[in-house]
Amino acid sequence: LAGHVDSYFAVLVRVGLAALVFLPFLRTRGNSLKTVGLYMLVGAMQLGVMYMLSFRAYLYLTVSELLLFTVLTPLYITLIYDIMSKRRLRWGYAFSALLAVIGAGIIRYDQVTDHFWTGLLLVQLSNITFAIGMVGYKRLMETRPMPQHNAFAWFYLGAFLVAVIAWFLLGNAQKMPQTTLQWGILVFLGVVASGIGYFMWNYGATQVDAGTLGIMNNMHVPAGLLVNLAIWHQQPHWPTFITGALVILASLWVHRKWVAPRSSQTADDRRRDCALSE
């Protein structure tokens, strides 16, 4: 789609279809306007703004470069979660996330092109908005919970509003989808990848700690290459693929085995000390 279909229109169709999937679950009863607005805000950040930046980045980057530049997201997730939770930064979480970054970087590193800095800036802004939206959703489920299928109705509505505004202000009506394949890709991305995929991803995000969430974010790199192999028969570079995947899995093992239990024990000790001092 990149370069052939207007990126703002592609975002509009993608989040619009995702919003339609969850429209039957839109509920206002029992939820304050502030809560509804916050769920719309995290949707606007995680999908609306993130998609626009990502689609724009495709104009400057190869697929390999874009995947390479997304590997820093685990660090953003762990650090932003600590900031939103108003807790001390957990450097153990950052360390295990860094291992996942190294693993993904091993898999995806390739020769970069001339538009390195433009692409890098766009993708990092995209990574940050995605992390803010994802962590924001996780925090809202901890502090202002509602049934997740209802929450996602508001989530996608927020993303859709951003996409509508962007399309009217910046869209190019001369670059509409021209082929059945292009429309088919947009429908698949909207209904399956966004509508169902992001719901499952964010639901899972509420079931794990921020460190695990950050690490698993980089599993999309080996998973994406396996899908590319299955559908398009494009072989990855197996030595780096296997090495990088093992490093990512090792980072998850280190985090679950040592980092997360130690962080939990430290938090319990801190609460116990506070109770004794009172």
Q: Where are these predicted regions, by residue range?
A:
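Transmembrane alpha-helices of multi-pass small-molecule transport proteins
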Residues: 3-49, 76-77, 129-136, 153-170, ...
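C-terminal-most transmembrane helix of multi-pass membrane proteins
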Residues: 11-16, 218-278
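Transmembrane alpha-helical segments that form core, pore/gating elements
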Residues: 18-22, 77-78, 112-171, 186, ...
